[in-house]
Amino acid sequence: MAKKSLIEREKKRQRLVRKYRVMREYLKKKEKQVFSLEEKSKIKSKLQSLPRNSAPTRLHRRCVLTGRSRGIYRDFGLCRHIIREKAHACLLPGITKSS
């Protein structure tokens, strides 16, 4: 089980990404459309003034149940350990052992 502080930090990042997504997309589109160097630098400074954690590249996938950050399957949102346990208990429909 991951530390609660790490899980909460990740949730905070997700909230920030959702909050600033529209603004970030707008500034990036505008930067591509503008040709003058001065305006580009102004837009770039506005983009850099946004919170660092509002960038989607700073997000990490975490297991929904345990908070583990590695070995996450996108389809389920679970780590490999939990998927194995749930599959053996027949709690994941459509999952069978390969051998």
UniProtKB/Swiss-Prot annotation:
Any Pfam family the entry gives: Ribosomal_S14
GO BP, sorted A to Z: translation
Cellular compartment(s): Plastid, Chloroplast
Domain of life according to the entry: Eukaryota
SUPFAM superfamilies per UniProt: Glucocorticoid receptor-like (DNA-binding domain) (SSF57716)
A single MF term (Gene Ontology): structural constituent of ribosome
Keywords: Chloroplast, Plastid, Ribonucleoprotein, Ribosomal protein, RNA-binding, rRNA-binding
GO cellular component terms, semicolon-separated: chloroplast; small ribosomal subunit
Job of this protein: Binds 16S rRNA, required for the assembly of 30S particles.
HAMAP family, per the entry: Ribosomal_uS14_1 (MF_00537)
Family, similarity comment: Belongs to the universal ribosomal protein uS14 family.
Subunit annotation: Part of the 30S ribosomal subunit.
Protein name: Small ribosomal subunit protein uS14c
